[in-house]
Structure formats: structure tokens, C-alpha cells
Regions:
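Cap/lid segment of the alpha/beta-hydrolase catalytic domain
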Residues: 1-28, 83-88
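Acidic catalytic loop of the alpha/beta-hydrolase fold
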Residues: 112-117, 144-145
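Alpha-helical scaffolding within the catalytic cores
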Residues: 58, 86-97, 120-124
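Short beta-strand/loop motif that positions the catalytic acidic residue
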Residues: 102, 108-110
Length: 179
């Protein structure tokens, strides 16, 4: 019951409600996991990041709204769930709802031909986030996966924003002059 807020005999609410979606429960669990982690003596609560692939990419976006998250990297998800049939679902659990609240540094991993986190939705997602510290990696012909050559960007992103042991190169300036 992930892409639905409809009621069923086993859902929390007997009317259409975001709480009936598996996304609500997963996001709640992720927020509780953050609370658990920040209470552990071996964890620095000021250096928490979140990464997820596919459905985990959507969950990464839903979790990155939490101010305790200092860096995020959604892979193949979290940008395209905005066309659900339910107006209530779109207004509460659509990717744009979470993206508009993200202020932490975020690295989008988006293969060029992914069927789940569609690259055509990436410019809209980037424009929706509040963070000005963002990057995108796009791998050609990798469908719904990220391979080590592209995944390394995630590790470096977290090294920069959580460990302060790396600095990503600046985005080069580009221009186009038509004569």
C-alpha cells in the first residue's frame, strides 16, 4: 500500500489518509532511527547523513526534511512520485512536498534512463529544494542502478559534508555564444 492513502481493513485510518500509506510508516521509522542514532555514544549527532536507493531514494528525500540530517543522497528515487491519482496523496506524500522542505546539502544520483527516478523530473526537483548546496551525478545507460564509478560521488559528498575531509570541485562555469 505504498502508493496509496486509501483505507483498507488493515490500515490505521478507515478513511483516505496519509497514515494509510507505507510511506508514512517508513518515514516515521526513519525519524525514530535518527533519534535512536543521535542518542548512541559512538555517534556524532551533528554528522548524520541519509542515503537510499530506489524506494530508499524516496525515503531519503522524506527523511532529509529533518533538520538533524546534515547531508543527503537519494539514488534513483525521490524525484518522480508526483503523479499519483489521489489528490490527498500528492498533497502529503508526493516527492515535491518533501523536496520543498530540504535545506541540507543533497546529491542526486540519477542514471539517464532510470524508470523510477526519471531524469526528466530532475530539473524540477532541483528547483524545488531549499538547499543551494546540491549536485547531480548522471550515469549513461545504467537503468535503475548506480555503479561504483558514479557511486563514489556519494562517498565524497558525505566526506565533505559529514567528515570535512574532502572538498568537491566547484561546478565549472559554462556559457554558450551563438553567432
Amino acid at each position: 500500500q505504498f502508493p496509496s492513502a486509501r483505507s483498507a481493513s488493515w490500515t490505521l485510518d478507515d478513511v483516505e489518509s496519509p497514515r494509510n500509506s507505507g510511506w508514512f510508516l517508513c518515514a516515521l521509522a526513519a525519524r525514530r532511527a535518527i533519534t535512536f542514532l543521535e542518542e548512541q555514544p559512538e555517534v556524532d549527532p551533528d554528522r548524520l547523513g541519509v542515503y537510499g536507493h530506489s524506494m530508499g531514494g524516496k525515503l531519503t528525500v522524506m527523511t532529509a526534511v529533518d533538520s538533524r540530517i546534515k547531508a543527503a543522497a537519494p539514488s534513483c528515487g525521490g524525484i518522480s512520485d508526483r503523479y499519483n491519482d489521489s489528490e490527498l496523496f500528492r498533497a502529503t506524500l508526493g516527492d515535491d512536498v518533501s523536496l520543498k522542505q530540504i535545506s541540507c546539502p543533497i546529491m542526486f544520483l540519477s542514471p539517464a534512463n532510470d524508470f523510477h527516478g526519471r531524469i526528466g523530473d530532475l530539473p524540477v526537483a532541483v528547483n524545488e529544494i531549499r538547499s543551494t548546496d546540491w549536485r547531480v551525478t548522471c550515469s549513461p545507460h545504467h537503468n535503475h542502478q548506480d555503479t561504483p564509478a558514479y557511486e563514489v560521488a556519494t562517498l565524497l559528498w558525505f566526506d565533505q559534508h559529514l567528515k570535512q575531509t574532502f572538498t568537491m570541485p566547484q561546478t565549472p562555469k559554462t556559457s554558450l555564444q551563438l553567432s
